[in-house]
Every structure is written in structure tokens, then in C-alpha cells.
């Protein structure tokens, strides 16, 4: 049987440099030895035939994490390894006695260069079996990657992170799913989207790898037929996908449900929503002035994603209200138009505040339209406190707002009050609530502690087709 020893070390490590005499003893011993240096081919100086591993290929292939590492091979198969310095382990593995008698009995090693941040992914791309399926675009030496992304139409108007192989590989480590798995066909052009393509766009959006499960869930939710993504992309209305995230994942990845929850400044909120929009654009072909014919659009079509505040034990989270068990991480996708301010600094009872909110909600789309579009009501902590102090929870708030939003059809029909817009004249004798009771109004909690201000996010007028256009809630896996 062929026996062999391998040593991998680096000069920039006190433990490695301490073992100069040990390397010389191994090199003169009966078992052949290969000594690799990660950072300096002239080290160790006590050995004449050091192997240059500054490319780190050998370190990568031997999966080195700590240097120095000593490995014993028999017929090319690894029989054992030790790392750092421990005299007994080195003597046992090498078969030599009295190694490093003047040295301490043991000393910890140092981190290997091949596992330094950013290096591992580069080595996997260079020497591993990565095999990306997506087409690679080679840039010239003087090409600016940021400008190249703009020129190829891959951006939403803001700079994107160039999707290098290393960044894509790092992003894929955020999920256990096969990169080649088909997630779905993305409207409007129905391009095939794999997990790998999701990772590419997540890189471009600025996501961290730990956001990948949320991005994947949001994408899968958007492809559920009831969400009607194709229609949403083709409408001339304002709407785009709005993502509400619930459950433990919001805390795990640092999402914002507090101060400025609907605004800028939080990486997870901003980039998860942006990743979905980039996938729609780059894989599905949903680009403005092409299939996207929105008259005005809204700023949320760059990104609109936030977490619900679940810190109050008395409050039923949106995910639970929509049928999921407490503690389940979910995404809810809604056809959102943008934020409409609701200011009420005078109401002091829950009944009064609910009526006030209903008045504001009646303006969604148009004050004379009913059961025409859906909405989200984001209740701020100060407004919620008025409800909570009176013992009101989700059920009581929803019931009071729906009841207060009911209006006589004679005031809403086309032509009433001197305004042509309105509901079907056949409904003149009906009394109609503003929203469908089952999914027309989604109520969530979010926002900073100060301010008697809540928010209304109006919805797509396609919501009038209640059987085929609905918000959807989907579990994150």
C-alpha cells in the first residue's frame, strides 16, 4: 500500500511558522510528504520542494479549514487528519516519534485562506462542479458592470449589484432547493424561472442569502392563479405586488415592522420586494411601456414589502386570520397602489375611530365605488392602543369598519350627487359595504410608537372580480 503525508500551511500563521523543524523531519522521514504553502512558496524554508498553493486549489480540494493541517493518505484515500499543533496527534498520524521536542505540547492553528470571506465561493466556481445553467455574459476589461446592466435592460432604473458567479453561488446557499428546480413560468411572457434565476435577480436586488426563502415564497405566491399576476402586469391602473411578511422569519432576517415600516432604510424590506419585481421584469418581461402599460404607476413598483408587527399578544396576525397556524412564516401578496395617509388625532373611542377609518377607506378608488377594489389598512400603535384599551381585537375592528362603510345605493349610483362615476343604477335600492367581507379589507399592525397616523393601501380595481382576483397568503418553506 502506498502511504503519503500532506501538510498545508501558510507563513501568515504563528503556529505554522513554529513548525519549521517538524516539516524538515517529516520531509526526511520514510513516508513521502507533500508540503503546500497557501501564501508564500518560499515557506517553509526548512523544506526544498514546497508546492505553491497560492491558487488555493489543493486547499479547496482537501477541504482545509485550519492551518497547519496534516493528512495521511493510503492508496490515495484519506485515513486521518489533524489540524493545529498537538504533538501526540502529529506523531501518531506520521508514525514518527519525538517531533518538535522543544515546542509546546499543543497550540491552536489559524483560519485557512481558502475559507476567508468571498474566497470559498470563488474557489467553488473555479474548481468545483457548479455548472450554472443560465447564460453567462462576458464583459470587456474596460466595461463598467453597473453600466452594462443598464444597457442590457436588467434594471428597474436604479443600479443593480452585478450578478457574478461568486455572488450567485453565495445566494444559492440561502436555500436547500436545487438550483435547476423550475419555480414557475413568469408572466407576461411566461419565461421559465429556476431557483438559479431567482438567485441571480436576488443578487441584483441586493438581497442577502438568508432572504432567499422569502423571495421564493413571494414568487410562488404571485404565480397562484387567484393572484392574477398577468392581469396585474398588463393593467393601466397603479397597482403592483405588495408583500406582507408574517412569522418568525421577519425577526430572523431583521425585517422592519416599526418606525418607517412602509418606507426606506431596511435592507430586507427593500430588497425582497425589489427581487420579485426584477424577476417579473427580467424573466417574465414585465417592462414599462411594453406589456406594463400603467398610466402612472406607483413608487411601490420598485419594491413594496414590509413585516407585520406581531409583538402584541392580543392581536391576531394577518397570517392566522387567513388560516395559518400561529408561528408559521408566511407571505401575503396584495395588488397595492401606494400609501394613502389616514390622520385622526381626535377620536378617543374605538367606535369613533372605526367610523373615521371607514370614511377614509370609502375613498379608495372613488368614493362612489363599492365592492370594486380591495385595500389594506395598516393600523399604527397609537391608533391600535385605542382599540386595545377597549378590549377590541381584529374581529371587532373588522366588524365595526365594515358596518360603518355601508352606504345606500342611491348615493352611489352613476350620476348621483352630480357625479357620473358610480355603481350600477340597478343597485339604487341596495345598501352596499365598501369591500367584500371575506378578503376585501386586510388589516395589519405596523409603525412607530409615536403618531396618530395609520395608512391605507388601495388595491387594483380588478378586485371587483372577486372570484378570480384575490390576495393570496403562502407559507415560507
Locations of regions flagged by a protein language model:
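Short active-site neighborhood of thiol/selenol oxidoreductases, capturing the structured segment around
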Residues: 1-23, 33-34
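Catalytic cores of nucleotide-enabled group-transfer and carboxylate-activating enzymes in metabolic
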Residues: 2-3, 29, 37-39, 70, ...
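Structural motif
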Residues: 8-12, 36-39, 380-382, 446
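Thiol-based oxidoreductase modules, predominantly thioredoxin-like and allied folds used
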Residues: 30-55
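Short loop/turn motifs at secondary-structure junctions and domain boundaries
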Residues: 61-63
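Non-catalytic, surface beta->alpha helical segment in thiol-disulfide oxidoreductase systems
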Residues: 65-66, 71-107
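Iron-sulfur (Fe-S) cluster-binding modules
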Residues: 100-133, 140
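Non-transmembrane, aqueous-exposed alpha-helical and coiled segments at domain scale
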Residues: 124-477
Amino acid at each position: 500500500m502506498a502511504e503519503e503525508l500532506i501538510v498545508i500551511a501558510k507563513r501568515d500563521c504563528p503556529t505554522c511558522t513554529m513548525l519549521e523543524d517538524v516539516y524538515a523531519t517529516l520531509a526526511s522521514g520514510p513516508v513521502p510528504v507533500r508540503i503546500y504553502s497557501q501564501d508564500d512558496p518560499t515557506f517553509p524554508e526548512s523544506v526544498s520542494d514546497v508546492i505553491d498553493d497560492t491558487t488555493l486549489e489543493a486547499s479547496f480540494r482537501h477541504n482545509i479549514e485550519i492551518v497547519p493541517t496534516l493528512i495521511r493518505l493510503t492508496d490515495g484515500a484519506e485515513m486521518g487528519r489533524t489540524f493545529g499543533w498537538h504533538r501526540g496527534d502529529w506523531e501518531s498520524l506520521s508514525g514518527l516519534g519525538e517531533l518538535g521536542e522543544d515546542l509546546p505540547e499543543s497550540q491552536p492553528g489559524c483560519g485557512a485562506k481558502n475559507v476567508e470571506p468571498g474566497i470559498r465561493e470563488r474557489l467553488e466556481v473555479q474548481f468545483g462542479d457548479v455548472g450554472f445553467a443560465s447564460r453567462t455574459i462576458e464583459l470587456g476589461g474596460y466595461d463598467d458592470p453597473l453600466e452594462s446592466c443598464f444597457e442590457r435592460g436588467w434594471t428597474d432604473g436604479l443600479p443593480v449589484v452585478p450578478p457574478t458567479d461568486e455572488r450567485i453561488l453565495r445566494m444559492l446557499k440561502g436555500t436547500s432547493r436545487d438550483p435547476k428546480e423550475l419555480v414557475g413560468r413568469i408572466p407576461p411572457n411566461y419565461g421559465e424561472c429556476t431557483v438559479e434565476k431567482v438567485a441571480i435577480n436576488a443578487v441584483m436586488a441586493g438581497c442577502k442569502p438568508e432572504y432567499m426563502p422569502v423571495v421564493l415564497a413571494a414568487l410562488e405566491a404571485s404565480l397562484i392563479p387567484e393572484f392574477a399576476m398577468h392581469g396585474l402586469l398588463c393593467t393601466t391602473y397603479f397597482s403592483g405586488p405588495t408583500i406582507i411578511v408574517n412569522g418568525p422569519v421577519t425577526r430572523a432576517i431583521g425585517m422592519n415592522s416599526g418606525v418607517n415600516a412602509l418606507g426606506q432604510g431596511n435592507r430586507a424590506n427593500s430588497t425582497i420586494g425589489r427581487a420579485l419585481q426584477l424577476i417579473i421584469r427580467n424573466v417574465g418581461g414585465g417592462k414599462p411601456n411594453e406589456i406594463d402599460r400603467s398610466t402612472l404607476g406607483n413608487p411601490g413598483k420598485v419594491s413594496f414589502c414590509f413585516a407585520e408587527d406581531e409583538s402584541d399578544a392580543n392581536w391576531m396576525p394577518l397570517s392566522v386570520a387567513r388560516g395559518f397556524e400561529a408561528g408559521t412564516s408566511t407571505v401575503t401578496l396584495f395588488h397595492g397602489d401606494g400609501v394613502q395617509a389616514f390622520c385622526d388625532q381626535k377620536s378617543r373611542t374605538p367606535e369613533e375611530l372605526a367610523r373615521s377609518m371607514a370614511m377614509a377607506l370609502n375613498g379608495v378608488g372613488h368614493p362612489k365605488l363599492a365592492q370594486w377594489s380591495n385595500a389594506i389598512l395598516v393600523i399604527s400603535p397609537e391608533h391600535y392602543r385605542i382599540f386595545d384599551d377597549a378590549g377590541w381585537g381584529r374581529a371587532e375592528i373588522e366588524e365595526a369598519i365594515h358596518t360603518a362603510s355601508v352606504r345606500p345605493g342611491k348615493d352611489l349610483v352613476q350620476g348621483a350627487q352630480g357625479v357620473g362615476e358610480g355603481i350600477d343604477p340597478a343597485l339604487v335600492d341596495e345598501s352596499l359595504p365598501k369591500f367584500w367581507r371575506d378578503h376585501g379589507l386586510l388589516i395589519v399592525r405596523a409603525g412607530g410608537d409615536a403618531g396618530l397616523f395609520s395608512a391605507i393601501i388601495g388595491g387594483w380595481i380588478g378586485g371587483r372580480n372577486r372570484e378570480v382576483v384575490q390576495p393570496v397568503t403562502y407559507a415560507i418553506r
